[in-house]
């Protein structure tokens, strides 16, 4: 055997003795339990991370749902406000039209009343003028009691027909 292989032999024997001592002492159980506990700790951390991820996803979904609800509510509020504004505008327009119609009717009634009064006044003035003209004409043509009676009858008849 050469020197190199003798050295390798001693290294192999020393290694086997070292491993044998470790097995005899129970180091493999300590190393195994340390690896097992580390594996369990890593598994627990992974489970916690998964749980936190699910919780975060639930919160994100909840916030998105609430945002959609808030947007829908805001949209319905805007729609209701527009509808209310349109209703109020049409109501105000209807009231204004009613007011204008009533004012126009009142003005037309006043004008009609004034026209009727003016016609009545003109008829009365015309009747008086006709009666005076008839009195003057008949007064010069007919004299005495018969003339006075004819004039009175004619004046009364003209007044009743013109009024």
UniProtKB/Swiss-Prot annotation:
Principal cellular location given in the protein's record: membrane
Keywords: ATP synthesis, Cell inner membrane, Cell membrane, CF(0), Hydrogen ion transport, Ion transport, Membrane, Transmembrane, Transmembrane helix, Transport
Localisation per UniProt entry: Cell inner membrane
Gene Ontology CC: plasma membrane; proton-transporting ATP synthase complex
Any Pfam family: ATP-synt_B
GO MF term set: proton-transporting ATP synthase activity, rotational mechanism; proton-transporting ATPase activity, rotational mechanism
Family membership: Belongs to the ATPase B chain family.
Protein role: F(1)F(0) ATP synthase produces ATP from ADP in the presence of a proton or sodium gradient. F-type ATPases consist of two structural domains, F(1) containing the extramembraneous catalytic core and F(0) containing the membrane proton channel, linked together by a central stalk and a peripheral stalk. During catalysis, ATP synthesis in the catalytic domain of F(1) is coupled via a rotary mechanism of the central stalk subunits to proton translocation. Component of the F(0) channel, it forms part of the peripheral stalk, linking F(1) to F(0).
Protein's name in the database: ATP synthase subunit b 1
The species this protein was found in: Xanthobacter autotrophicus (strain ATCC BAA-1158 / Py2)
């Amino acid at each position: 055997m050469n020197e190199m292989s003798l050295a390798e032999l001693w290294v192999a024997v020393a290694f086997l003795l070292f491993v044998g001592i470790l097995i005899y002492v129970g180091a493999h159980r300590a190393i195994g339990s340390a690896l097992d506990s580390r594996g369990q700790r890593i598994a627990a951390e992974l489970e916690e991370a998964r749980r936190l991820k699910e919780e975060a996803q639930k919160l994100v979904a909840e916030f998105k749902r609430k945002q959609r609800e808030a947007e829908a509510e805001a949209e319905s509020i805007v729609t209701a406000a527009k509808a209310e504004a349109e209703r109020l505008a049409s109501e105000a327009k209807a009231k204004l039209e009613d007011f204008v119609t009533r004012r126009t009717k009142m003005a037309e009634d006043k004008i009609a009343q004034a026209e009727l009064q003016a016609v009545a006044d003109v008829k009365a003035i015309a009747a008086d003028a006709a009666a005076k003209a008839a009195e003057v004409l008949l007064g010069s043509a007919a004299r005495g009691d018969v003339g006075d009676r004819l004039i009175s009858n004619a004046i009364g008849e003209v007044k009743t027909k013109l009024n």
